[in-house]
């Protein structure tokens, strides 16, 4: 039996708390059996018993009034004409009108009614009594009900080996059916004997699926065709694209070939808003986005490689794990990657490099959900790692709004189709968070524990009243939110627009400030480099000057030595044999001259003298 609604009561309303304690068992009364009564007991055998096997019926009577009906007919002929005048004859009617207009009673009646009609006509010309003063404003129902949600139904995977509900899709006509894709996302850990079937459920019959879809490989994505509710598009784990027509049965109607399909699991498939309703595109973790036409699905019509370096190299491509397309922007699409980068692309670009317009980086892990706001397409929601972020196309460096980091990993998210300021997120602890930016921005307006298993996907109905959540064990829970979360509030569009514009302006100011700081740091770094270069240049100049001075003085000293040596060579040599020593005074004078010449020349002079003596032949 499912819990439909949980009644919550404050602790103070339970009354006084009961304090129990343990104690030993006590015997309050002991009645022994009476052997006399046991002796009087007689067992009846056999025993006659009556059984009524027919269904219980009751008689009811009702007395209703008899409703009598009869057929009536009216034949209307243009009145005001005599019997002898045929209204179909133009000449007879003109002749009769002229006759009546000449009648005095007709003239008097027209004169009397003319003044009254003239007054009414003037009033009509002056004031438009049929003007709708508040026609531009939408009729908004103001609700003061607190945000709440309740479980409507639960759809469980009928297979014994449970699989993860990886994707959900609502039936486009009336939203009375729900298509669920089942697969095992753990790499190379699929259990033996696991079924590949996915199912279409009827909301009023949760016990048994309406149709089973039988692909060749487990489905990761499954989407209804918005123009033909009998056609579904699926992305397989082996990279193939499959198409079903429920009128033809459970088997695949169209299937792409392995050679021209994706190399990795297909995590995103979207139908395009084309005239034929047969065009779609898909994305995979192999880094490719492919366009298909289900009339010829054997190979893609176009391929775009998610290489942000714009070199069209598949080995550098980023793996796509989420896909977004807005019908109001038919040439643009966005891709969420495993590396936490959102790539904005233009399909109609002339060259492959121009197809990747820009990137948005802000998540630390894969982006599991990516969706534009249905009211303001330039703002989009991303869900990854531990937070959800709201971006603006005008601010590329960072998101304009984001949630706090949660303890559990976020797995999916979506905008409300009826309220521009409301979005939903699912977490791996089995919790569904409903955020209302008008109500509060720091915390979710409602946090609901859906199940104990991790939630992997969610999908919101077009009316915004119902939310379907898929879990790790294949359980799809259908929730109904309160009217306060599914009804457009008064002035909510203006408030949401002002919130997004305000946060966008704030991010632009911060980006400009950061840009200035980076330029200043770059200028300082360049200045430091210039100072270092100037210091190095100054040191080099000093070294060159010192070296030049040393070389200059060496040349000068060498030249002086050479000149002194030449001067000594030209000086006449004293002849000791011819000198006549006349006295001690003359001898002292000669010795003094020799000492002076030895002091001037130093050691070199001595050496030169020795050379000269050797040349002259010392005795």
Curated annotation (Swiss-Prot):
Region (Disordered): 566-619
GO cellular component: 9+2 motile cilium; axonemal dynein complex; axoneme; cilium; cytoplasm; dynein axonemal particle; external side of plasma membrane; glial cell projection
Principal cellular location given in the protein's record: cytoplasm
UniProt entry keywords in alphabetical sequence: Cell projection, Cilium, Cilium biogenesis/degradation, Cytoplasm, Cytoskeleton, Dynein, Microtubule, Motor protein, Repeat, WD repeat
PROSITE patterns linked: WD_REPEATS_REGION
WD repeat residues: 214-254, 261-302, 362-401, 405-445, 450-489
Gene3D superfamilies: YVTN repeat-like/Quinoprotein amine dehydrogenase (2.130.10.10)
Annotated InterPro entries: Dynein_IC, WD40/YVTN_repeat-like_dom_sf, WD40_repeat_dom_sf, WD40_rpt
Extent of Acidic residues compositional bias: 581-597
Record localization: Cytoplasm, Cytoskeleton, Cilium axoneme; Dynein axonemal particle
Molecular function terms from GO: dynein heavy chain binding; dynein light chain binding; microtubule motor activity
Domain of life where this protein originates: Eukaryota
A GO biological process held by the record: cilium movement
Disulfides per UniProt: none
Family statement drawn from the similarity comment of this UniProt entry: Belongs to the dynein intermediate chain family.
Stated role: Part of the dynein complex of respiratory cilia.
Subunit structure: Consists of at least two heavy chains and a number of intermediate and light chains. Interacts with DNAAF2. Interacts with DNAAF6/PIH1D3. Interacts with HEATR2; probably involved in outer arm dynein assembly. Interacts with CFAP53.
Protein's name according to its UniProt entry: Dynein axonemal intermediate chain 2
């Amino acid at each position: 039996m499912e819990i439909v609604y949980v009644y919550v009561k404050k602790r103070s309303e339970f009354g006084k708390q009961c304090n129990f304690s343990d104690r030993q068992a006590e015997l309050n009364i002991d009645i022994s059996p009476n052997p006399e009564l046991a002796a009087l007991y007689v067992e009846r055998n056999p025993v006659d018993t009556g059984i009524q096997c027919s269904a219980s019926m009751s008689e009811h009577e009702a007395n209703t009034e008899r409703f009598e009906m009869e057929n009536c007919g009216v034949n209307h002929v243009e009145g005001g004409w005599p019997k002898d005048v045929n209204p179909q004859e133009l000449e007879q009617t003109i002749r009769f009108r002229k006759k009546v207009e000449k009648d005095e009673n007709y003239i008097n009646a027209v004169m009397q009614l003319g003044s009254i009609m003239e007054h009414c006509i003037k009033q009509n010309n002056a004031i438009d009594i049929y003007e709708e003063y508040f026609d531009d404003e939408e009729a908004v129902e103001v609700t003061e009900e607190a945000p709440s949600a309740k479980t409507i139904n639960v759809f469980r995977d009928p297979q014994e080996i449970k699989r993860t509900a990886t994707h959900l899709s609502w039936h486009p006509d009336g939203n009375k059916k729900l298509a669920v894709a089942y697969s095992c996302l753990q790499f190379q850990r699929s259990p033996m004997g696991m079924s590949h079937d996915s199912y279409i459920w009827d909301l009023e019959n949760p016990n048994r699926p309406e149709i089973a879809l039988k692909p060749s490989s487990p489905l990761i994505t499954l989407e209804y065709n918005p123009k033909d509710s009998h056609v579904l598009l699926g992305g397989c784990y082996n990279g193939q694209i499959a198409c079903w027509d429920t009128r033809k049965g459970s088997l695949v109607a169209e299937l792409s070939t392995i050679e021209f399909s994706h190399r990795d699991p297909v995590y995103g498939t979207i139908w395009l808003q084309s005239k034929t309703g047969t065009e779609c595109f898909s994305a995979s973790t192999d880094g490719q986005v492919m366009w298909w036409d289900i009339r010829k699905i054997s190979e893609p019509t176009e391929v775009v490689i998610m290489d942000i370096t714009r070199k069209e190299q598949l080995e550098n491509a980023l793996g796509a794990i989420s896909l977004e397309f807005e019908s109001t922007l038919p040439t643009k699409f966005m891709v969420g990657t495993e590396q936490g980068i959102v790539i904005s692309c233009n399909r109609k670009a002339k060259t492959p490099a121009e197809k990747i317009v820009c990137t948005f980086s802000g998540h630390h892990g894969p982006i599991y959900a990516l969706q534009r706001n249905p009211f303001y397409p330039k703002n989009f929601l991303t869900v990854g790692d531990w937070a959800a972020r709201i971006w603006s196309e005008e601010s590329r460096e960072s998101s304009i709004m984001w949630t706090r980091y949660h303890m559990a990993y976020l797995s999916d998210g979506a905008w409300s189709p009826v309220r521009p300021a409301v979005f939903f997120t699912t977490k791996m602890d089995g919790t569904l968070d409903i955020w209302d930016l008008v109500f509060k921005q720091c915390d979710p307006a409602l946090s609901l524990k859906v199940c104990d298993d991790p939630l992997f996907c969610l999908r919101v109905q077009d009316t915004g009243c119902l939310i379907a959540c898929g879990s790790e064990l294949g359980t799809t829970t259908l929730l109904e939110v309160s009217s306060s979360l599914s009804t457009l509030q008064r002035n909510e569009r203006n408030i949401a627009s002002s919130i997004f514009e305000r946060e966008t302006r704030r991010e632009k100011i911060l980006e400009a400030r950061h840009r200035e700081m980076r330029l200043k740091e770059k200028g300082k770094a360049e200045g430091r480099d210039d100072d270092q270069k100037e210091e190095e240049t100054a040191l080099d100049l000093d070294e060159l000057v010192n070296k030049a001075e040393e070389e200059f003085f060496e040349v000068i000293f060498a030249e002086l030595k050479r000149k002194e040596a030449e001067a000594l060579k030209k000086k006449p040599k004293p002849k000791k044999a011819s000198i006549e020593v006349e006295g001690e005074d003359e001898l002292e004078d000669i010795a003094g001259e020799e000492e002076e010449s030895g002091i001037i020349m130093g050691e070199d002079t001595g050496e030169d003298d020795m050379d000269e003596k050797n040349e002259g032949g010392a005795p």
